[in-house]
Amino acid sequence: EQLKLGGEMKDISIMFCDVRGFTSISELYDPEGLTQLINKFLTPMTQVIMDRMGTIDKYMGDCIMAFWNAPVDVPTHVAEACNSALIMFEKLEELNLELEQEAANNNRAFLPLKIGIGLNTGSCCVGNMGSNQRFDYSILGDDVNLCSRLEGQSKGYGVDIVISETTKIAAPEFATIELDLIQVKGKTVPVRIFALLGDAQVLTSEWFKDMSAVHAELISEYREQNWGNAKALIVQARAAAGDKF
């Protein structure tokens, strides 16, 4: 009943998830095997999103675009998106163990699947979009484009999940650290980006408190271009985090 022809503006949490280095992985499979691999990847990832009240917008090869808070209202949409991203990495670890065993059984080389995720929250136009002949329920807007850009930043910064400042502010119960202030294509104002590292349990852990305190100093020295101090703080931050990430 809440579906409407055309579009409406709504506050939405958006996710882009993409497989890294998929070209190298695809070379290990024939077309049928590659299709099976994609399906094995998309199925558990989709289930996580749907279990947390997300809507799959579309699949683009090995990429998933999803959003929360439409067509059904989800008051906790920011938290649902963040939790989905974290759980997806747990499911990916399980899938890679299965794929590694399959590769060993078939005497085939194994490359683990690795993904990057971008999350953003903002006002989007959501509704039935397309032509008179065919339309899809989808979202449009600058915040959708930004989310795609955030996913692309995950590899460059060496983190799993990159989120916007808007998402970070709306989800204070999650463990995050600032990554940078970047200029994104198509935007005139620099965008502050963060890495999502964990849930409330991580946020209250001693290792995260220690690491995030050092990391805040690191960001400050980095912005002041005190490179020597920044490098020393990188070592301290890594030591505080240990093998957590």
What does each of the following model-derived ranges do?
Residues E1-M9, E93, E98:
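Regulatory cytosolic signal-relay segments
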Residues L3-S84, Y137:
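Catalytic NTP-binding/metal-coordinating core of nucleotidyl cyclase/transferase enzymes
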Residues E8, M15, L34, F41, ...:
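Helical mechanochemical/support elements of P-loop NTPase systems and associated helical scaffolds
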Residues I38-G54, A70-I117, D142-K155, A175:
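Alpha-helical scaffold within the catalytic cores of cyclic-nucleotide enzymes
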Residues F67-H77, I117-Y137, S154-Y157, L197-A200:
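Catalytic strand-loop-helix junctions within cyclic-nucleotide turnover domains
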Residues C124, C147, Q153-S220, Q236, ...:
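Cytosolic regulatory/linker segments at or just downstream of nucleotide-handling modules
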Residues L218-N229:
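Short helix-adjacent coil turns
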Residues W227-L233, A237:
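Solenoid-repeat scaffolds in large eukaryotic assemblies
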